[in-house]
Amino acid sequence: MAATMTVEEVRKAQRAEGPATVLAIGTATPANCVYQADYPDYYFKITKSDHMADLKEKFKRMCDKSQIRKRYMHLTEEILQDNPNMCAYMAPSLDARQDIVVVEVPKLGKAAAQKAIKEWGQPRSKITHLVFCTTSGVDMPGADYQLTKMLGLRPSVKRLMMYQQGCFAGGTVLRLAKDLAENNRGARVLVVCSEITAVTFRGPHEFDSLVGQALFGDGAAAVIVGADPDESVERPLFQLVSASQTILPDSEGAIDGHLREVGLTFHLLKDVPGLISKNIERALEDAFKPLGIDDWNSVFWIAHPGGPAILDMVEAKVNLNKERMRATRHVLSEYGNMSSACVLFIMDEMRKRSAEDGHTTTGEGMDWGVLFGFGPGLTVETVVLHSVPVTA
C-alpha cells in the first residue's frame, strides 16, 4: 500500500512557488461621454434646478477645480427624463436604479473582462477564480454569477462577490487575488471592478455637498492574476509583492454611504484629504521598511484619485515630484472618480505609457511601486508592486 501524504506535503503541493502577478488588464466605459465644462448647465437643467442660482455657481466652481476634463455615464438624458424621481434630491427611486444597475454592471464588467482575456491569450476555461466588485446595486445571484454565465466560464469557477466596499476596493481585490493565486497552484484569477453612478445620481440640494455629483464617473476594469506564469504564452505586467489594509485613526464618519429608498447617498467630511495625507507616510513606511526603501520618489505611484485635493495633499506631505502622479492624474482627468475601478485604469495607463515613453520597466522605469486605495472607514489599502521589464 502506497504511503499517504502528510498534511504538510499536501499544503506544499497546493501552493504556488512565486508571487502573484498581473498577467493582463482590460478596461471599458459606457458610450455616453460628458464634458466637465458643460456638466453644470446639463446637471441643473436635467434635474429642473436652474432656479438654484447660487448652488449652481458653487457647483460650477467645484467642477472647474476638479481637474476632470470628461467622464462617462450610463445615465443619458433620455433615461433621466424617463425616471424623474432619480433627478429629485430625495424621491423614492431605488427600484428604478436597481433595475438599471443589475443589468448594466455585469454588462460593463463583461466588456472589460473580454479585453483582459483577449490580452492574456489563454482559453477562458483556465480561469479558476472570479472576484467581482461593485458599489452599484445588489442582487442574488449576484453580478459574479451573471458574468460567469455571460463569459461562458466553467460552472466550477470559484466566485467571490464584493458589494458596497467603495473607493478603496481596487486595492482589496488585488489583495484577495494575490492570496488566491499564491495559495492555489495553477490558479488564474479574473478580477472585475464595475461601477455605474446610476445608484448615486440625484438632484442638487443645499444640504448636499455635491462632491459626488462633481467627481463620479462610470467604468469597469478587469485584470487576470496568477503565480508562476508560463512565459512562453503569458506576459507578466506587475508582481504583487505585499498587500495590507488599515483603518485610519480618528476617521470614523469621514466617508459614509447609505443605501436607502432614495438610492445610495454619500456623506463626506471636508477633512478627508487631511486625514489621508496625515497618515500616508506611516502606510509607506510600514510597506517599504522591509525592503529598505525610504525615498518615495524612487517608487512608481498608483493612487486612487478620490479628488484633486487628496492628490495635492499627499504630494505635499511626502515631497513627491509632480511626474510621480502623472498616470493617476491622467485617469482622473479623462474618466473622473470611478470608485474601485480607478486604480486598475491607472495600472493600465502606466504600463502603456511606460512602453510608449521608452522606459525599461512597466513602472515608468522603476522597479518598485505602491498602489493605494482610499475609501469609507476611512480605510486604506496598500499594495506593494514590482514592475517587469518592458517587452516589445
From Swiss-Prot:
It comes from Secale cereale (Rye). Keywords: Acyltransferase, Flavonoid biosynthesis, Transferase. One of its GO terms (biological process) is flavonoid biosynthetic process. This is Chalcone synthase 1. InterPro entries: Chalcone/stilbene_synt_C (IPR012328), Chalcone/stilbene_synt_N (IPR001099), Chalcone/stilbene_synthase_AS (IPR018088), Polyketide_synthase_type-III (IPR011141), Thiolase-like (IPR016039). The primary product of this enzyme is 4,2',4',6'-tetrahydroxychalcone (also termed naringenin-chalcone or chalcone) which can under specific conditions spontaneously isomerize into naringenin. Its EC number is 2.3.1.74. Pathway: Secondary metabolite biosynthesis; flavonoid biosynthesis. GO terms for molecular function: naringenin-chalcone synthase activity. Disulfide bonds: none annotated. It catalyses: (E)-4-coumaroyl-CoA + 3 malonyl-CoA + 3 H(+) = 2',4,4',6'-tetrahydroxychalcone + 3 CO2 + 4 CoA. The active site is at C167. It is an enzyme of class 2 (transferase). Belongs to the thiolase-like superfamily. Chalcone/stilbene synthases family. PANTHER family: CHALCONE SYNTHASE (PTHR11877:SF14), HYDROXYMETHYLGLUTARYL-COA SYNTHASE (PTHR11877).
